[in-house]
Regions:
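Low-complexity, intrinsically disordered or signal/transmembrane-proximal segments
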Residues: 8, 22-23, 28, 34
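Polybasic, lysine-rich low-complexity intrinsically disordered segments
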Residues: 2-4, 11-13, 26
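Iron-sulfur-associated redox domains of electron-transfer enzymes in respiratory
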Residues: 32-200
Length: 200
């Protein structure tokens, strides 16, 4: 009885440690979690437009949600979430034309923080139909002058490429979902290729 109690006390003092070696190969198993590939940081920004491209984007996202949730980190997308940040983006998507000084300043800030910038939709790509006032006659311009002053509008509506460098474009009003997906895949491929070349 006394010997049994001594053995029990010894087991408490020296607990059995499980081996981290695989029995068949005698190779140590790593206990640390595998590193995941960093997600691609996305920003989705809207300027002067009807936002129909945002609708198309969300429809495409619904169809590709299972793959996109593993691939993308939406850092800024007000149509999708309430918490948004402007820090660093791998891809910034811009819809809408540039109609004010504030738009221009914000667009330049986004460009400076983005590896790739994609203009989506007609207003962003060609400045229309948001830029119809560019073709107004003097009388029409005089009639809307008070509105331009109130909203600190630019004298002329600009497309995105008038203000910053654009890496890719998806035209249309609204944009074609298949063409949008094609551009997304192409730009993602370019980013992956650039990342791989840096590792060499």
């Amino acid at each position: 009885m006394k010997k049994t109690l001594m053995l029990q006390e010894r087991k408490k003092s020296f607990p059995i440690r499980r081996s981290t070696f695989h029995h068949s190969t005698n190779t140590q198993i790593s206990m640390s979690p595998q590193r995941k590939t960093p997600k691609i940081k996305i920003g989705w920004f809207t300027f002067s437009c009807c936002e129909d491209n945002t609708v198309v984007m969300t429809e495409v996202m619904n169809d590709h949600w299972q793959e996109w949730k593993e691939l993308f980190d939406f850092r800024y997308a007000r149509a999708l979430q309430s918490k948004n940040v402007i820090d660093e983006f791998d891809i910034a998507f811009i819809e809408g034309a540039v109609t004010s000084e504030n738009h221009g300043e914000k667009l330049k800030e986004i460009r400076a923080k983005s590896k790739k910038l994609v203009a989506v939709g007609a207003c962003a790509v060609i400045g229309m139909p948001a830029g119809q006032r560019n073709a107004y006659k003097k009388k029409q311009k005089d009639e809307i002058e008070f509105l331009l002053t109130r909203f600190a509008s630019l004298p002329k509506v600009l497309k995105v490429s008038d203000v910053v460098k654009v890496d890719a474009e998806v035209p249309g009003c609204p944009m074609d979902p298949n063409q949008f997906l094609e551009v997304v895949n192409r730009v993602v491929g370019e980013l992956k290729k650039e990342a791989a070349s840096k590792k060499l």
